[in-house]
Amino acid sequence: MRALETIATLREYRKSLKESVGFVPTMGALHRGHQSLIERSLKENSHTIVSVFVNPTQFGANEDFSAYPRPLEKDLALCEKSGVNAVFAPKIGEMYPYEAKQRLKLYAPAFLSHSLEGAVRKGHFDGVVQVVLRLFHLTNPTRAYFGKKDAQQLLIIQHLVQDLLLDIEIAPCEIVRDSDNLALSSRNVCLNATERKQALAIPKALEKIQQAIDRGEKACEKLKKLGLEILKNLEVDYLECCNHKLEPLKTIEPANTLVLVAARVGKTRLLDNLWV
């Protein structure tokens, strides 16, 4: 496996690849959810590149960029064991050669980025677009793999590729859950035993909503009320039913509905969702 730290070495490596390339962008602290993206890329492509880069532009003023976990050696070992061909782990100066005021400004589309996560974390998706577009230019992948757990991010990346006419297939990957049904997240390590039990209300609420939909319930207000009752002991940022343009829905639209939840357990903020 190649461990690449500079754009020059990545470009040289990329030029040597003649067949399909799968790309898995990450911020490190890899877990089984990331591993499932890697495994799918390995299955569908001749070569797989993983990036490990904690992107400063997607952190807000009140979010502790310096505290984000960076177990790079552990991440490299996981990638090598999985069969990844190359890992790109650049320093900030490689990805952002100019200071902020000299940088080209890129903005995520407002209709997808200003609600839900974008309302809570203002400017977050602008930072995501900044780094993902740079990584796409550098890796020039055939396919890029994103988890469905970060549903709003996935929709924004899909729109980015379509709007900028990029020849990249975006491959959405299913949510991976732990044995207790909690969606895997790098943030889960911040939960103590008591908080972990409390956090299980999130998948339970979504499961209850799915069961109601399966029984024929289509009214979004009723479904949200059902979920919020289960989440009553958590600090809920939002529980919403939206279509794939993130427009609020009054009734469920088959194959075009997302039920999105964000809630805080102690100091840890967790996301989960249903694709209906």
Swiss-Prot record:
Belongs to the pantothenate synthetase family. GO terms for biological process: pantothenate biosynthetic process. One of its GO terms (molecular function) is pantoate-beta-alanine ligase activity. Gene3D superfamilies: HUPs, Pantoate-beta-alanine ligase, C-terminal domain. Its main location: cytoplasm. It comes from the Bacteria. Catalyzes the condensation of pantoate with beta-alanine in an ATP-dependent reaction via a pantoyl-adenylate intermediate. Beta-alanine binds at residue 58. It catalyses: (R)-pantoate + beta-alanine + ATP = (R)-pantothenate + AMP + diphosphate + H(+). InterPro entries: Cyt_trans-like, Pantoate_ligase, Pantoate_ligase_C, Rossmann-like_a/b/a_fold. This is Pantothenate synthetase. The keyword Cell inner membrane does not apply. The gene is panC. It holds the Pfam family Pantoate_ligase. ATP binds at residues 27-34, 147-150, 176, 184-187. The keyword Signal does not apply. One of its GO terms (cellular component) is cytosol. It is found in: Cytoplasm. Pathway: Cofactor biosynthesis; (R)-pantothenate biosynthesis; (R)-pantothenate from (R)-pantoate and beta-alanine: step 1/1.
